[in-house]
Structures are given as C-alpha cells and as structure tokens.
C-alpha cells in the first residue's frame, strides 16, 4: 500500500526507533496509519492501524446538563461564548447525523430544561432526566448511550468538575474512547475547570474543540452532501475563519447575476 503512494503523501519523523508514517487517504474508504519499526533482522516491518480520527459512523455526542441554572455558575469562560460553542457543536452533530444523547438534572426544581438555543439545534431529541451527578450511574441514561452501539463518545457539559468528569472517567474504565469538547464545557472557576480536564486526560480522554470536531467529520470540502451545512456553521460560529469563508464566497467568487 505504501509503495503505491506518492512521496508527497508520506511524511516521516526520522531518527527514532519507531516512527509513524501519515498517509493521505482522502480517496480511501477508511483512514489508516502505517507504523514502521525495525525487525530483529534489521529490516523494516509495516503495521497498519486505524487513524484516531472520528467519523460520522463511529461516535455519539453526549450533551450533559446544558441548562441555564447550571450555566449561571460557570466562570471558566464567558457564558455567551460557551453557549455559542455548544450550539455550534450541536448543529455539527445534527448535520452529520450523529446519535445525540442529552441528559438533564434537577430540571423542574432548579436547573431548568436544556437551554433553548441548544434544544433548537438538536431538534426533537428529548433529554433523559436523572438524579445522579454521574450519568454513567443512571440506568436509563447509560442504557441510552450503550444502545447506540458506538464506543467513541464526544462529551460536552456542565459542570466540568462533576457532571462531565464523572461519566467520562466511568466510560473510560469500561473501554470507551472519549473525547472532551473542552470549549463546549464550563466549570466553576478557570482553575477547577482546567484541573478536571487534566484529570480526564490523565485517565485517557482526548481533548478537542467544536471546530476540530466539525473539520474532522467533514475532512474533505468536496463532500457535497454536508458542504453547505458545514460551511454555514463555520460562517456563523467560527469567528475570523467564518468571516474569511464568507469573504471568499462573496468577493473572490461572487454569485453570478
């Protein structure tokens, strides 16, 4: 397989006992990573493993306690910025048809329902109400995750120190591959938010952002079935990057009269 690729498609890091060759595979059905290491006779051996990139077919989005009553306590990030990030993530999951599990706690006595802007982005998805701070210890909520049949989780929620970190640690212990969408999570203080992220990362979670999730799922701007939707999300929520895309569309390639 490697011999069939052009040199420009392969990059390696020399000088190490074991190096990884990243292979451009935009035209292939699955992404692969070739790991090259010397064998006992001095010759290189090539092992093929999957790249750790998410696809629309292998991950589930968990939206945990995205409720106004809990957002009031967030001090790790500007609340409006956080809300915009979560909405962008929710729109992305909807566009790429990911299973979405929303869960709430104390919705009728304090926290309120899923925030309206987020609910609008996920359509008719109904939140699973629970009492336990750890979603993984709630039978109904955990069953909803298991029922998707997917072992890769994207997690966004409030608060990072508890209702995000507890189920993440539990899911990792059960063998799930968990990515924390860190800019779509909020904590009580910048320090406690950061410490919670560090604890989850130490346990094996991967840190990511909503824009990386979108770009990782899209990957190729010639994927026309999601191009317009992905571009619309970027233009609405990705700051200067979105402004640049809008400019390119309107000025460099203006619509024909």
Predicted segments, located by residue:
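Low-acidity, Ser/Thr- and Arg-rich intrinsically disordered low-complexity segments
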Residues: 6-19, 26, 35-39
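Active-site acidic carboxylates
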Residues: 36-132, 194-201, 206, 218-257
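Distinct, well-ordered alpha-helical segments
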Residues: 111-118, 141-142, 167-169
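Glycine-rich oxoanion-binding loops at beta->alpha junctions
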Residues: 127-146
């Amino acid at each position: 397989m490697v011999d069939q690729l052009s040199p420009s498609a392969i990059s390696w890091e020399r000088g190490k006992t074991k190096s990884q060759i990243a292979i451009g595979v935009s035209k292939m059905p699955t992404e692969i990573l070739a790991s090259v290491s010397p064998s006992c006779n001095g010759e290189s051996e090539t092992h093929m493993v999957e790249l750790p990139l998410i696809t629309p077919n292998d991950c589930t989005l968990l939206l945990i306690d995205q409720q106004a009553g809990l957002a009031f306590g967030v001090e790790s990030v500007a609340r409006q910025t956080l809300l915009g990030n979560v909405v962008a993530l929710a729109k992305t999951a909807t566009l790429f048809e990911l299973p979405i599990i929303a869960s709430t706690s104390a919705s009728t006595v304090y926290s309120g329902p899923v925030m309206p802007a987020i609910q609008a982005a996920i359509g008719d998805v109904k939140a699973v109400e629970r009492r336990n701070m750890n979603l993984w210890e709630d039978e109904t909520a955990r069953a909803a995750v298991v029922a998707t049949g997917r072992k890769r989780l994207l997690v966004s929620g409030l608060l990072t120190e508890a209702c995000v970190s507890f189920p993440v640690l539990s899911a990792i212990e059960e063998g799930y591959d968990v990515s924390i969408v860190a800019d779509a999570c909020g904590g009580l203080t910048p320090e406690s938010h950061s410490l919670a992220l560090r604890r989850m990362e130490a346990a094996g979670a991967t840190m990511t952002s909503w824009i990386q999730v979108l770009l990782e799922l899209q990957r190729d701007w010639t994927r026309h079935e999601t191009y317009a939707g992905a571009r619309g999300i970027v233009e609405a929520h990705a700051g200067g990057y979105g402004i640049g895309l809008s400019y390119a569309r309107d000025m460099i390639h203006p619509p024909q009269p």
